[in-house]
UniProtKB/Swiss-Prot annotation:
Name this protein carries in UniProt: dITP/XTP pyrophosphatase
Lineage, opening ranks: Bacteria, Pseudomonadati, Pseudomonadota, Betaproteobacteria, Neisseriales
Active site: 73 (proton acceptor)
Binding site for Mg(2+): 73
GO MF terms, alphabetically ordered: dITP diphosphatase activity; ITP diphosphatase activity; metal ion binding; nucleoside triphosphate diphosphatase activity; nucleotide binding; ribonucleoside triphosphate phosphatase activity; XTP diphosphatase activity
Keywords recorded for this protein, A-Z: Hydrolase, Magnesium, Metal-binding, Nucleotide metabolism, Nucleotide-binding
Residues binding substrate: 12-17, 74, 157-160, 180, 185-186
Native source species: Neisseria meningitidis serogroup B (strain ATCC BAA-335 / MC58)
Length: 199
């Protein structure tokens, strides 16, 4: 990338994601601002893939903010459920209101009795320099784990308390922040994005 932006807008209202991306970009002296700082309305996510939804959100945020924008579309995919909840992870149990607890309970109920508890977190990041960027930068990270029937840990959000990592003997919510920032699906996708941005 020819010049490094000082500020980018994150196309999300999720406080957990904002903190995570803020920490990951800090070493590069790039400030990550929430789209709420610009009064950006929520972008529809009508598409069946992580890539299409992330691209729509990035263009939407760049249009309203006038800044380069980063969007992520991410979710958990359970092998026994053919990849569900997938793109529906954030609203798996509905919208009234969105709730991590309700989402976790729904997925836990659907995995009861399933022999295959393997699942993965997927993160697709899309960076656009401006709203009409003809060459968006796309990166993907996949973090493999197992569904844990009992929630463990406080250091995380979303499905983290149930996402068990056999190599650590812990759930994602039990990992130290430093480890999570190095190994998570978002960290993997961001590492690929940073390589492509040549920061």
């Amino acid at each position: 990338m020819s010049e490094k932006p000082e500020k980018i807008v994150l196309a999300s209202g999720n406080a957990g994601k904002l903190e995570e991306f803020g920490n990951l970009f800090k070493p590069y002296s790039i400030t990550v601002l929430p789209q709420s700082a610009f009064g950006i309305p929520e972008c529809p996510e009508p598409y069946p893939t992580f890539v299409e939804n992330a691209l729509a959100k990035a263009r939407h945020a760049a249009k309203y903010s006038g800044l380069p924008a980063l969007a992520d579309d991410s979710g958990i995919c359970a092998a026994a459920l053919n990849g569900a909840p997938g793109i529906h992870s954030a609203r798996y149990a509905g919208d009234n209101p969105k709730s991590d607890t309700a989402n976790n309970l729904k997925l836990a109920a659907e995995l009861v009795g399933k022999a295959d508890k393997s699942c993965c977190y997927v993160c697709v990041l899309v960076f656009v320099r401006h709203k009409d960027d003809p060459r968006p930068i796309i990166a993907e990270g996949v973090w493999h784990g197992q569904w844990n029937d009992t929630p463990l840990g406080q250091n995380g959000f979303g499905y983290d308390p149930y996402f068990y990592l056999p190599e650590h003997g812990k759930t994602a919510a039990e990992l130290d922040t430093e480890v999570k920032n190095r190994e998570s699906h978002r960290a993997q996708a961001l590492a690929e994005l940073l390589r492509k941005l040549a920061l």
